[in-house]
């Protein structure tokens, strides 16, 4: 309890609590700061570094803790690191039980899976697919954007990272977003010139992506 309170007091937006999760502990913490880790191996929750089988289902965990947390990190343990795809149906079962934030992990290995999870309002935690370059982050990010709504362009609001002041409104196509993510410098699409342009190339006033 003291460690959790200290981490939150030091500015953590969220903390993840796994084996230690209990009604007593969670009731003493601000629930908007808490994600409960549910580690599932073949349909049963495992704790203590995945070494202890509890015999409890993930569904029971959600019913038990749903009023005490902000959301869940749900890991399919038997799929973790295998690069064979995750268990989408098991994850969707959890989605049906809660409206809270849900992050899925374990075996996610393709952009199609990421898109399917996103469609169901489920975030993806990626590991091995990034390390092995099976999925590139910039490709995954772009896949979540709907470029077709406005003739392959999306409005891009540019904001100062420190002051939060809105600096400009520009438009980006997929190539502009990809270049921005790869180079770290803001690149947009000029509708008047019908071409990409990187802010600051001539003036030197670059916009760095943070």
Question: PLM features: what roles do these ranges have?
Answer:
Residues 15-19, 75, 80-83, 103-107, ...:
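Glycine- and other small-residue-rich loops at beta-strand/loop junctions that grip anionic moieties
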Residues 2-80:
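Conserved anion-binding
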Residues 30, 66, 96, 118, ...:
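Anion (oxyanion) recognition and catalysis
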Residues 142-210:
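Binding-site signature for planar aromatic cofactors or substrates
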Residues 1-14, 26, 89-124:
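Catalytic cores of alpha/beta
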Residues 57, 83-86, 109:
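Short secondary-structure boundary/capping elements
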Residues 23-36, 114-143:
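C-terminal helical cap(s) of enzyme catalytic domains, especially alpha/beta-barrels
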């Amino acid at each position: 309890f003291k460690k959790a309170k200290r981490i939150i007091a030091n500015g953590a937006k969220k903390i993840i609590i796994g084996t230690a999760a209990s009604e007593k502990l969670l009731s003493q913490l601000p629930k908007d700061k808490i994600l409960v880790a549910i580690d599932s191996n073949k349909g049963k929750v495992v704790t203590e570094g995945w070494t202890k089988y509890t015999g409890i289902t993930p569904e029971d965990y959600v019913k038990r803790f749903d009023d005490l947390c902000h959301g869940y990190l749900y890991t399919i343990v038997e799929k973790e690191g295998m690069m064979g795809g995750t268990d989408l149906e098991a994850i969707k079962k959890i989605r049906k039980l809660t409206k809270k934030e849900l992050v899925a992990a374990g075996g996610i290995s393709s952009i199609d899976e990421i898109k399917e999870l996103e469609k169901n309002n489920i975030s993806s935690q990626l590991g091995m697919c990034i390390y092995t370059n099976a999925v590139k982050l910039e490709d995954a990010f772009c896949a979540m954007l709907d470029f077709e709504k406005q003739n392959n362009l999306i409005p891009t609001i540019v904001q100062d990272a420190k002051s939060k002041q809105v600096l400009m409104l520009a438009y980006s196509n997929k190539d502009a977003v990809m270049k921005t993510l790869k180079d770290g410098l803001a690149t947009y699409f000029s509708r008047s010139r019908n071409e990409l342009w990187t802010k600051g190339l001539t003036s030197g006033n670059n916009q760095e992506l943070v």
